Amino acid sequence: MAGAELGAALEQRLGALAIHTEVVEHPEVFTVEEMMPHIQHLKGAHSKNLFLKDKKKKNYWLVTVLHDRQINLNELAKQLGVGSGNLRFADETAMLEKLKVGQGCATPLALFCDGGDVKFVLDSAFLEGGHEKVYFHPMTNAATMGLSPEDFLTFVKMTGHDPIILNFD
């Protein structure tokens, strides 16, 4: 599926769940630093997404944290029970295969494309921070989509993923 088709497929799934979203288009961005000037006016929790694999390339994780978090992969590996030093960034080819999105577009909204190979790790601050909206890329890094934390969790569970919720404070 091409980018526009993926975006339409996402919108169809969200619509089927009666999930209301707010979308802001902006220039393509590849880092949180590039993104923030375009969306800092949006109130809520903004995301940073890491697509990771274990050393043996048998397991994949999509890790979604607040945009300003610094993540220690060794600490995260211990929390996930995979052993320090065993987590690394997956390449774009793996992300395209598993989530159908490329570099700069990692998003938990792409979990509907996964056939069950990707484990989803979510920063507890998205659910416990009292945020009116949480923001992610909608299958493209040229837009940002906001939805309520409750609707986001409903969507993630509809994809067949039970999030691993971790506290990153």
Swiss-Prot record:
Pfam families, sorted: tRNA_edit (PF04073)
PANTHER family: PROLYL-TRNA SYNTHETASE ASSOCIATED DOMAIN-CONTAINING PROTEIN 1-RELATED, YBAK DOMAIN-CONTAINING PROTEIN
Superkingdom of origin organism: Eukaryota
Residues making up the signal peptide according to the UniProt record: none
CDD domains named among the record's database cross-references: PrdX_deacylase
Record SUPFAM superfamilies: YbaK/ProRS associated domain
Family the UniProt entry places it in: Belongs to the PRORSD1 family.
Gene: PRORSD1P
Protein name per the record: Putative prolyl-tRNA synthetase associated domain-containing protein 1
InterPro entries for the chain: ProX/PRXD1, YbaK/aa-tRNA-synt-asso_dom_sf, YbaK/aa-tRNA-synth-assoc-dom
One MF annotation (Gene Ontology) recorded for this entry: aminoacyl-tRNA deacylase activity
